[in-house]
């Protein structure tokens, strides 16, 4: 099993559209940072202030860099539909049923995937093809 690099120093960091750290992140920027800490270069997709554009960018890139899986492992990307019509959010699975993420009005947090608010919004689990075998 892979081990997600320590991320406790990221908890509480603020949200910023297009944020790639070190002081602020958007949801995909946080994923990029976690992969960087694990020694992996996650491809960065053009960030935009339009949440629909962010989701579309990831989904287009996912075809080349990620494979959809059914059971999450550490460092898998979980996509969520938080807006009514499209996928617009992601988090990184950190094990034990938990994921780390950030949203526009929520600083970096680690939450339980099984809570109703997140469980019914999940739209897919994606594994980066560049991850070493588990």
Predicted regions and their residues:
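Short, hydrophobic secondary-structure boundary micro-motifs
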Residues: 17-19, 43-44
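Glycine- and charge-enriched low-complexity intrinsically disordered segments
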Residues: 116-134
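Active-site nucleophilic cysteine motif
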Residues: 18-38
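Conserved catalytic core of Hanks-type protein kinase domains
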Residues: 9, 34, 93
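...with weaker cross-activation on analogous glycine-rich loops/strands in unrelated enzymes
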Residues: 4, 43-108, 113-114, 134
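Residues that form or immediately flank small-molecule/cofactor binding pockets and catalytic motifs
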Residues: 20, 104, 130
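Glycine-rich, flexible loop/turn motifs
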Residues: 11, 21, 41, 109
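N-terminal intrinsically disordered, low-complexity, charge/repeat-rich segments that act as generic
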Residues: 1-18, 31
